[in-house]
Amino acid sequence: MRVSDKRVLVTGGSGFLGRHVVASLQKYGCRDVTVVRKNQCDLTHESDVKQLFETAKPHVVIHLAAVVGGIGANHDNPGTFFYQNVMMGALTMEHARRVGVEKFVGVGTICEYPKLAPVPFLERDLWNGYPEETNAPYGMAKKMLLVQGQAYRQQYAFDAIHVLPVNLYGPHDNFDPASSHVIPALVRKCVEAVDAGADEVVCWGTGNATREFLYVEDCADAIVRATEQYDRPDPVNLGAGFEISIRDLAELIASLTGFTGRLTFDRTKPDGQPRRSLDVTRAKNSFGFAATTDFPTGLKRTIEWYKVERAKKAVTTA
């Protein structure tokens, strides 16, 4: 399949990952992209979803829409995260099947993996345990996309695939302290501390947990590659192939933002999953994907983007 001659529907297309996927589709020659925005279409309402497909008439669906957040947001809203993600996925795939969509790309999450899966995570270990408790409702909801896609492939010969991105970062991320993930949260804290002349930044947890991070533009490229080239029922990991502790991450962000004060780790806050890192062999062998943005470069771009956006907001509110 080539996206250049297809009508592509991208749910969540104006979000953090979505805007980069739309840009990547355009780089691959796709000129007919429909972006679904929440204020225009509620994917948890079947009537909205039905109308969407009748209007857009897509050949391909890339389902990115999700209710997401960091450890705190997952802890406070487990029911919302489960229900809304399950409903959006189930309704979107069902109506894609009904109208004869040629390819459905379900974008899952590393949170689907068992809490104590061997590191690096292999796709074959996806069902060998329950996800980490702090984000299990979200992870299980996204995992249902995989189950539904495999069931539809078996019963209806519906071409659905499932990709598993690791933690993402980059420009246009969510920097809201109430719901952001670790990188934007630390970037914001350090930048604000520098501006305020503060001598301390408080980080959640022990700092011992490890994570892998994939630059958002690299992930977008991987998703389009998978759309064109991957046609198997098995899930496929999308990652950068490295692992870093939260403590080392915080020190790196502090250095890049110019924060020279003290990093304090609040051990009363949860670490989340002890380790996260993906084996990316399947993606490399199946559609030639390898991340091209090294971590310090990606962080620098993210920090600079945040500083520019912060300055713009300061001007508009002055």
Give each language-model segment a name:
Residues K6-Y28:
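N-terminal Rossmann NAD(P)H-binding glycine-rich loop of SDR-like oxidoreductase domains
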Residues V22-Y28, E192-A318:
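C-terminal substrate-binding subdomain of Rossmann-fold SDR/epimerase-dehydratase oxidoreductases
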Residues Y28-Q51:
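Adenosine-cofactor binding site in Rossmann-like domains, unifying the SAM/SAH pocket
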Residues D42, E112-P114, P137, I161-I183, ...:
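Flexible, glycine-rich beta-alpha linker
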Residues E46-N85, R98, K115:
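NAD(P)H-binding glycine-rich loop region in Rossmannoid oxidoreductase-like domains
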Residues F82, V86, T134-L146, D176-P184, ...:
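Short-chain dehydrogenase/reductase
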Residues A90-N135, I161:
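Conserved Rossmann-fold NAD(P)-dependent oxidoreductase catalytic core, especially the SDR/UDP-sugar
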Residues E133-V166, A185-D195:
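Active-site Tyr-X1-5-Lys
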